[in-house]
Amino acid sequence: VENGPQLHTQSTLSDRAALGQPPEEIAAVLLPGMRDKLLQDGQIDRAALDAIYAAGKAADHPVIRDYAEMTVAAADIKIAVRAQKTGKPLDFLQRALAPCDSLDVEQLAKAAVEGQDAIYSYLQKTAYADAVPVLQESPSAFERWCDNRIIREIRPQQYNPFTVGPLAAFLLARENEVKTVRIILSGKWNHLREEAVRERMREMYRNV
């Protein structure tokens, strides 16, 4: 049954409440399972980032290596920012952050525990210093910044036809175009102002 575990949890919760069991006792029963689920999700995310990075390192072309580096670094930054806002401890960050060449994840983890300003201060010393004002603006602005940076880095491949670079760049650019179309459609469906949609728009691979 598709919703079996969820329905079972809801049933357990309502049954215990109906029997007059105090909320704190209900939470003591249910929360460990929820924590385990969050831990499993974090482990899966970390494994996925490690796999992306390993594949990038093994690639022959710098476009693929640079894409893997940027993808993992951006994910680490987002994890650190979210963890800081939700008060996650250092050991959580040490498990969640995936190592990469452009970030010292141990320093990033410690900065996230220290506070938001510490994250910004650390990033100012890295290749992602220009991401700091974007992060201060909003999470969606940082997402846009990441996508635009990737597009700028792969754009020169248009003029390098005798390697795998143009094909890799084309596939990444097509993914970016699909994301942009979804942003436009979502804005239309949700009746967002044109300015709100435009500020989420990504740069295109070929600016015709």
Where does each model-flagged region fall?
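Extended alpha-helical surfaces
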Residues: 1-208
